[in-house]
Amino acid sequence: MSNPRTKSPNTNRGQGLRSERSALLNDSLSSLNGNSSYDSIKDSSKNNKDVAEVNEYPRRPESSVSVVSNSPHRQDAATTNTVSTVSVSKVLPALLLGVVLAALDNTIVASTYTKIGAEFGKFSQVSWTATAYMISCTAFQPLFGKFCDIYGRKKTLLAAYCVFGIGCFLCGTSRSLWQLVAARAIAGIGGGGMNSTVSILMSDIVPLKQRGTYQGIINVFFAIGSSLGGPVGGYFADQYTWRIGFLIQVPLIAIAFLCVYFTLNLPHHNHVSFMTRFRKIDLKGLILLIIGVTTMTCAFTLGGNVREWNDPVVISLLIASSISYLSFVYVEAFVAFEPLAPMDVLTERTCLSSYLCNFFHSVANFGWIYGMPLFFQSIKNEGAEKSGIRLIPMIIGSSLGSLLGGAVISLTGNYKKITVGSYFFGSVAALFMLRYGYSNFNWEYAVYPFSGGLGNGIAVTTTLVAIIHASPSAFQASAIATSYLFRSNGCVLGVSISSSIVQTVLGIKLRKSLDFDVDELLHHLRKDISYVHRLPEEIRQTVLDALLGSIHYSFLFVSFMFFCAFVCSMFIKNRNL
């Protein structure tokens, strides 16, 4: 049996803990030897069963559990635990339905937040409906990766479906903005669990060289859900009420639950009590992560919007966030026996580079999703439905990019070159969006978002394959969940920072352009952005120009984030599959 990394005799406490975990891992694998659930998968394939029997444990038997070697031609252990194409085809539709709904719920607020803000009279605070979803999604995704190890893939996925459905129902029945924010947080927990668990499950049943293709398919359906979120939410908001957009998801998620329950048959764990398994969860790390994500988001939401950046509250939140994140890293490295984000993964060069790429391109992507509807609803005076439709070219580009990235990996076995090129492409596309408001060519409203989406879609697929290829097999579930942690952190900051940039720059420009106190004007604009078109004609154009300039700064920020991802992608090791 291949042993995990051996440590020097002069190890610190954290290294000792990791060695102890590795020893326990070897013992558990030895006990599973000869009775592996991976063997049952191969037997089920031979018997031509039409259900996917997937190992509930992510840890491979002897020859499969190994740390990534320096050789670029590491044996693909996953090829030993695949199921037939027929079996995958039975399971995949049930998984994809959940992916579509999670993606739809992720973007449904993008085209409805003006309606929600107007109904509750709190436009400046309505961005919390998006950030609350992302906070909970971010904080709990690593936990779902650990749940997959402890309770198994199927139970974890079904639990995520239940939490998501409850959250959607509460969203549709909320009677105040803060009730809606709390409901969005509940939905975010389930949505994050659905996304990460599906990727972990597919990683178990698909060979490494084909994972790019299957991940591309998953990303396409995620893109379909994302593209539907804006138009569907905008349509219901314009024609009926924004609440229907949330309530309609409840019966659909129930269908997904039933499909997974009946089509995904998995071997059972050895019988261990719930509390025995629960004690394995890194609660200290989880609490620190929740505090870090929440305080960081609060700081960027309040700063430049409700409070000045030098306000003691904003500064305190930034300090608290920094301390929480540093403490989280310390706990994961030196305290946690079963860490949410293992250091064996975080310290691997390709994994870390890919994680940073995921973070930066997620910041860029959600900054884009925030900025585009704002541009069309404020500058172009379009309705929520039409501004949501404007997001479709970007989503189509992302879908095609995911398939292209997977196809290139399957054909060439190389993922670095196309990753580097995709981020450069996205950065340039975002720069061209600075022409918005000055150009009279309507095709530019589609081509630039499509190009940026294409680059983003390629990178989402290729970086995940890089992480799977580079991570130790025993920690693959945690490695995948950690990638979603970095993505979700980026999504939270993408919305919050973009909103803060627009609000801050708008205030600066208006104070320079107008010769009266603009605080009341800013107050009205923050409550309802469409107020700009009800202003007196003599100041309306001045305010529109200031608003356009502030949105351009958010697009410039998007371009810079893509460039940061481009730089990080240069450090990914070029291992051919």
Swiss-Prot record:
Q: What is this protein called?
A: Vacuolar membrane amino acid uptake transporter fnx2
Which residues lie within the region annotated Disordered?
Answer: 1-80
Question: Any S-S bridges, and between which cysteines?
Answer: none
* Bias-annotated ranges (Polar residues): 1-14
> Which GO BP terms apply?
asparagine transmembrane import into vacuole; basic amino acid transport; isoleucine transmembrane transport; L-lysine transmembrane import into vacuole; transmembrane transport
Q: Which UniProt keywords are listed? A: Membrane, Transmembrane, Transmembrane helix, Transport, Vacuole
The residues that cross the membrane are: 91-111, 123-145, 157-177, 186-206, 217-237, 244-264, 286-306, 317-337, 356-376, 391-411, 418-438, 448-468, 490-510, 547-567
Q: Which PROSITE patterns match?
A: MFS (PS50850)
Classification via Pfam families = MFS_1
Ranges of compositional bias, category Basic and acidic residues: 40-62
**SUPFAM superfamilies, per database record:** MFS general substrate transporter
Listed InterPro entries: MFS, MFS_dom, MFS_trans_sf
Low complexity: bias regions: 22-39
Outline what the protein does. MFS-type transporter involved in vacuolar amino acid uptake.
Q: Which family does it belong to?
A: Belongs to the major facilitator superfamily.
GO CC annotations on file: cytoplasm; fungal-type vacuole; fungal-type vacuole membrane
Recall the GO molecular function terms of this protein's record: basic amino acid transmembrane transporter activity; L-asparagine transmembrane transporter activity; L-isoleucine transmembrane transporter activity; L-lysine transmembrane transporter activity
Q: Which cell locations does it reside in?
A: Vacuole; Membrane
Topology relative to the lipid bilayer, per the entry, is: Multi-pass membrane protein
